[in-house]
Amino acid sequence: MDPALLTPMMQHYVELKRQYPHAILLYRLGDFYEMFFQDAQLVSRELELVLTGREAGAIGRVPMCGIPYHAFDRYAAQLVAKGYALAVCDQMEPADQAKGLVRREVTRVITPGTVIEEELLQARQNNYLAAIVRLRGSKQTVWGLAYADISTGEFWVCQGEGQEQLEQELARLQPAEILLPTEEGLGLGLMRPGDPQAPLGLPGQYTYTLRPAEPFELATARENLLQTYGLRSLEGLGCEGLPLAIRAAGGLLHYLEETQKNLVQPSPQGGHPLLRPPRTYQLTDYLILDTQTRRNLELTQTIREGAFVGSLLWVLDRSRTAMGGRTLRRWLLQPLRDPEQIRLRQDTIQELLESPSLRTRLGSLLDSLYDLERLANRVASGTANPRELVALGSSLGKLPQLAELVAEAQTPLLQSLQQVDPALVDLGHRIEHTLLPSPPPVLTEGGLIRPGVDAELDRLRQQVEQDRHWIAQLEKTERERTGIPTLKVGFNKAFGYYLSISRAKAQQVPKEYIRKQTLTNEERFITPELKEKEARILTAQTEINQREYELFVQLRQEAGSQAAAIRQVAQTLAAVDALFGLAEVAVQQGYTRPVITADRRLIIEEGRHPVVEKSLPQGLFVPNSVRLGSPHGPDLIVLTGPNMSGKSTYLRQIGLIQILAQMGSFVPARRAELGLCDRVFTRIGAVDDLATGQSTFMVEMNETANILNHAGERSLVLLDEIGRGTATFDGLSIAWAVAEYLATQVRARTIFATHYHELNQLETLLPNVANFQVVVKELRDRIIFLHQVQPGGADRSYGIEVGRMAGLPQPVIERAKQVLALVEQHSRIGLGLRSQGKSRPSSNNPKKRFKQESNSRGIPDCDAKAGDQLSLIPTSLYPEEL
């Protein structure tokens, strides 16, 4: 397009659009942000707005779409949520003061990962911007990851190996945007979720931004980090020997510098104005929960509806602040492996439990706090509005009360609140003494500053008040002087102040009145003196608004200079709030403190599923116990029982209790002793993956393979109905082999729920396997689910009885019984492998032992041979002492 064919304003628009080709350009024209050309068509379609046109010069009309500036946040939130980037071009001078074309500049670029506006964020979830650098070798991908939330100041870096680990970290973080250097093989630009051109080997559900490679180069990235944080070495950050993590962090910082020009100004105190120095972590520092485990255990949302209600977080989150809620969510998705850190959290919960009065008063104070984490970055970026600054002042003003409340605290976290930074208290008082308690949200309309703060402001206000009083008295004096009882003083934005007189009295108007407007029932007049007073009021009001704005900006800058200290206090308060919430849950639900051990034990007495228990009337949930991990119990439990008996609930509650314990929480059990886990694996239910063309069984096998390849003896494995997605004998064979491998090779603590009752035979073959069942009570015409887990293996699944309960027609039920009888009669595997006893055999040779028992029970030779084949486990797999 030839710029010469465009109007000057359109030429400027096109020039800016070329600078930001991958963003929607919102161009401020008066009271609207306008979009043109393809951007207009896109926004019109996405937001269902009217598409109009505008004369652009010699090329004629071009597509145009606009949004009111006062509704910017609402529309911007929708576009950002859809994965778009926005370049916001604002007017830098009033239109009536411009000499020629109004000066406009792009003040910021809003991308999914660089949002700081409250309206565009979820209060209790982080909004992460991530950067990845990968080196794909012949063996394994080595990667560096940096991620930050510029609304809270968090900044983390990590380096690892293996594509699977990287994808699991991304799944935990759910970043709003991921930055990649162009060395990944793609051109520059933004790729929205679902884009078929997604970077090779990375999940397609994220927004990717492809960036120039230079800021990600090691020397450039390293220098950026050193200069930004005023360092001579990166050793203090813990990432000196992690080159890929350094590269990712440097690329992330450069992106913020480029897109947030007006927000990322050098801090007077040094460091980055929005991000604290990056913290380095290792994946092995935390309990690893893969995507399937987080989904199957419904940690943050339910499987069916994807809802928050019904998740574990729904039960746990009793925090009083948004920052406490975000902290709790992070802890839940990243449980600890450091027993000392776990103990510190437990100690704080214990102290709060043992002091109900402290807990009550602390809850009230936390209730009065605002989101200090995000408020700190709002003032640091210079974007906090008057109400947000009032909220900051109010929250800082509570710090002395918090310090007094925890004066006798015994735990380190609560004790840290005893030391209050006087500068923050002074700042809080200054804000409260400067700003009115309920200021308007718009910064330029006045009504911000309290009387007595500024002498010049007080003088101007007094002048306006006197002039308005004169105008108010004018109505009375003019009525008396003219003898017109209907005379009134009015005001509107178009004409200013005027004298209103009914048409019937128009003949009595004094000669000095100047007619301004004639309406159906009235005449409107002005006088020179009235206009003089009006001019004085308007001039003074403009000066008042400008002075209030200046005072507010000064105060906001003062608060911004304390942003780092505010973030530090906010981090402590968020942790206290999260633990306060866990203490509240422990009291309300009767949770107990688990004992964390260094061995492999997993002992839970009368454990309960926290979500199911919460959803049932009090006292109706049936608790169950478990002992796992030799020598305290078996390494693998084969769990059998009918459909609907509660096997899946039992599996999930064990996993949830382990996770709760390692995040530092108390647990729903009468007693628990738990050895630290490195990973929790689950395979509970499966569905077709149509997107990749995988059947239910293939999905199941992929998940099972992942467990067998990555689990170790410090892992917890929870498996439900392995092998059910294929033919019966194939499924049984796979289930047998998987259970056998877990018990003999992996030695992970495992619960293996199954309807293949033949697996009960493993108890007689392997000394570290035990059978347990969920029992039912049989009546003449129905069964009652007792939901009790007891030693021993079940020999029936009661599937037909469950079908009757579900409403299957009676002829179907009767025919099913006939077929079942035939199948059981002719199934050699069923006859050959069904366990007839619970005692452990004395023979040390499992193959010989099975043969002897088969013959002694009179099992036909063919069946014994089939059983012998299934039990051909190499003797080397059986340690003498398990």
From Swiss-Prot:
Alphabetized InterPro entries for the sequence: DNA_mismatch_repair_MutS (IPR005748), DNA_mismatch_repair_MutS-lik_N (IPR007695), DNA_mismatch_repair_MutS/MSH (IPR017261), DNA_mismatch_repair_MutS_C (IPR000432), DNA_mismatch_repair_MutS_clamp (IPR007861), DNA_mismatch_repair_MutS_core (IPR007696), DNA_mismatch_repair_MutS_N (IPR016151), DNA_mismatch_repair_MutS_sf (IPR036187)
Q: Where is the composition biased (Polar residues)?
A: 836-845
Under the GO molecular function aspect, what terms does this record hold?
Answer: ATP binding; ATP-dependent DNA damage sensor activity; damaged DNA binding; mismatched DNA binding
| DNA repair listed as a keyword | yes
GO biological-process terms attached to the record: mismatch repair
Signal sequence annotation = none
Q: Give GO cellular component annotations, separated by semicolons.
A: cytosol
Q: Which family does it belong to?
A: Belongs to the DNA mismatch repair MutS family.
> Main role?
This protein is involved in the repair of mismatches in DNA. It is possible that it carries out the mismatch recognition step. This protein has a weak ATPase activity.
Protein name per its UniProtKB record = DNA mismatch repair protein MutS
